[in-house]
């Protein structure tokens, strides 16, 4: 299992930097088909939401879609997936910032 940081996840998702995006994608593709082989901690998720919202001007709906897609990816493992799902539901249904309880 490897751990990835916010930068790798942002580059993979946004494909905003040709060189870094290719490297991030290649790294993640090495683990395709291997369940729970890429660890993402809670801080990375919080930073991802902040970067997508503030830096890339993603809407709340776009961020929710990205988070649900990430959490549905079998290769990714999380610090506490149940709490993260609850955080997404809270974020989706209330006028709040994204918080991990």
Predicted segments with their positions:
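Amphipathic alpha-helical segments within well-ordered protein domains
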Residues: 49, 53, 68-71, 88
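Glycine/small-residue-rich phosphate/adenosyl-binding loop
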Residues: 57-67, 71, 75
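Short, well-structured N-terminal submotif of metal-dependent ribonuclease cores
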Residues: 1-40, 55-61
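Acidic active-site catalytic centers that drive phospho-/nucleotidyl reactions
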Residues: 5-7, 47, 100
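Short beta->alpha linker loops
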Residues: 43-44, 82
